Amino acid sequence: SRLQKLLNCPAKQIVFTPTATIALNIIIQGLLQGERKTVYITPFEHNAVTRTLHHFELLGKVAVLQLNVDGHLRYDIDEIRQQFSKNKPDVLIMSHASNVFGLVAPVEELSVLAKQQGATVVIDMAQTAGLIPCNTGLETIDFAVFAGHKTLYGPTGISGFAMKPTANLH
């Protein structure tokens, strides 16, 4: 489909939702079933991610840890590698670009580090899908969320996510 080409993920399935918030909630709730999980997020996540994770934190189902950035808002890859060694990630959720600071995450590099630890990787591209290229077709990315009404220039009410066919949501 054209959307798969635009997101550079021809082998992934597309699931449509009314909003990116709903897409993120479906993914997060589906991934956090079962035993307690360790979830890493960036310091720049949207409330759609942080509020949902906070709810699961209160239930004792998740430990939420933040990826380290330095004083210049750059991701410290060596420090993140150490973080992952100390506390193995089950899930990594990261905004492709912050809706506040505009900081673009090194998605490819961070997803490889997370996958080396066996984590499921979720990329929130609500601000960037169709605007800033991201190779969401990589095997290291399990889910990529998009908002149709933002930089895809579609109508309101068309959002969703691309997912690997082997991705497992409960």
What are these regions (language model features)?
Residues 1-170:
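Pyridoxal 5′-phosphate
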